[in-house]
From Swiss-Prot:
GO molecular function terms noted in the UniProt entry: rRNA binding; structural constituent of ribosome
GO biological process: translation
Cellular component per GO, a single term: ribonucleoprotein complex
Protein name: Large ribosomal subunit protein uL5c
Keywords attached to this entry: Chloroplast, Plastid, Ribonucleoprotein, Ribosomal protein, RNA-binding, rRNA-binding
Similarity comment: family membership: Belongs to the universal ribosomal protein uL5 family.
Protein purpose: Binds 5S rRNA, forms part of the central protuberance of the 50S subunit.
Compartment(s) of residence: Plastid, Chloroplast
Matches recorded under InterPro entries: Ribosomal_uL5, Ribosomal_uL5_bac-type, Ribosomal_uL5_C, Ribosomal_uL5_dom_sf, Ribosomal_uL5_N
Length: 238
């Protein structure tokens, strides 16, 4: 049985190292292993950030050369890497989409660029979001990865306000890798493993305390099932 109060163990990390990568390798891994010996006795089972994917859908606006070019320049400035143009796999007549038509942009960051972007995201970008109240833990998917959406590009320091004709957002997905044994590969386990790592990485989660009153993963899972049942019941009554 796992103790949900391990989410608060972030307090044991007292100083920020040169960057997020250095802090993870030299501090976070050791603290997580020390405080969760039953979960992460093998250091290879400790979850880690594998890659970050940034996506922007432009739709039919991608056919405008100027809009597409500006979006490419913004992605390059923000991520330090030239994006890949995403194209339609098949034609959809109802949406006026042709096969192989440009629809958006995507960037996959790994290694030093990934940690550089993550450091900027945590310590600068979130603070620039208007009325920011933290990230929801409910944005984890079944694989334990986390996706968040940003409404505008102006919150990044590389973007000049005078160069922006229209605000455009994008989605950011943080993909975690974990070699935990199959006995611990359930969806809820993966999600809460990601939550533990998020707290250590100083991500501003706004509702992680919701889980502190539960003593085990099974109780959290049951709570989620009850909420889903109540939601379906409300919809059926409407």
């Amino acid at each position: 049985m796992r103790n949900q109060h391990s989410l608060e163990e972030i307090a044991e990390i007292h100083s920020l190292l040169e960057d997020i990568k250095g802090e993870y390798e030299k501090g976070i891994r050791a603290v997580i292993k020390k405080n969760n010996p039953e979960l992460f006795g093998n250091p290879h089972t400790i979850p880690k950030l594998q890659k970050i994917q940034i996506n922007r859908g432009l739709g039919l606006a991608a056919q405008n050369t100027n809009i597409l070019k500006k979006s490419i320049n913004e992605f390059t400035a923000i991520t330090g890497q030239k994006p890949i143009i995403t194209r339609a796999k098949k034609a959809i007549a109802g949406f006026k989409i042709r096969e192989n038509m440009e629809l958006g942009l995507t960037v996959t960051l790994r290694g030093s660029k990934m940690y550089s972007f993550l450091t900027k995201l945590i310590f600068f970008t979130f603070a620039q979001i208007r009325d920011f109240r933290g990230l929801s833990v409910r944005s984890f998917d079944k694989a334990g990865n986390y996706t968040l959406g940003l409404k505008e590009q102006l919150i990044f320091p590389e973007i000049d306000y005078d160069d922006v004709d229209q605000t455009q957002g994008f989605s950011i997905t943080l993909v975690f890798s974990s070699t935990a044994p199959k006995s611990r590969s359930k969806t809820m386990d993966r999600v809460l493993n990601g939550m533990v790592l998020f707290k250590f990485l100083r991500f501003p989660l706004n509702d992680s305390g919701y889980y502190d009153k539960y003593s085990s993963f099974s109780e959290v899972s049951q709570a989620w099932d009850r909420k889903k049942h109540l939601r379906r019941k409300r919809w059926s009554q409407e």
